Amino acid sequence: MIQAAESGARSRMSFSETISPFFGRCAFVWFYLTSAMDILGNWRGIATDLTNKHVPIPPLVLLVVLVFILLGSISLLFGYHTRHGAVLLFGMTIVAAVTMHDFWHYGDASARAYQFGIFARDFAICGGLLLMVGMGPGPFAVDNTGKGGGKKR
């Protein structure tokens, strides 16, 4: 009975309810791929920042971050194992936020405010990723092309 009610509600989804999750996933992909391009374009500078934050083996860390970004972005773009991709990006983002944007350690008000802004942005992105973990990818996703065309849980 609940399943019938859910399938009836699902068939009455508006256009925006149907397409919004896909565009939301695309926004995440854009954010992470542009971040990857920034890492590639400023490799030495970011490696130096990591060294200054006492992160061991910065080139290896950056390589792992790029792999996580690529895998997570592909996952979100196609909606394939979306929840796994979102968890991967969530873990990477929260670690990066706490490690690299530790605003609570800054004495200068301007620098503290700048780092807080980046930390808050990353924290909000983590919230969006957790929503995707809980709610799934939306209707336009490879995850939803299981046997019988129904949504895989």
Residue ranges and their predicted role:
Residues 1-41, 58-71, 77-153:
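Extended, low-polarity transmembrane helix blocks
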Residues 43-56:
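Short juxtamembrane and helix-loop transition motifs at transmembrane-helix boundaries
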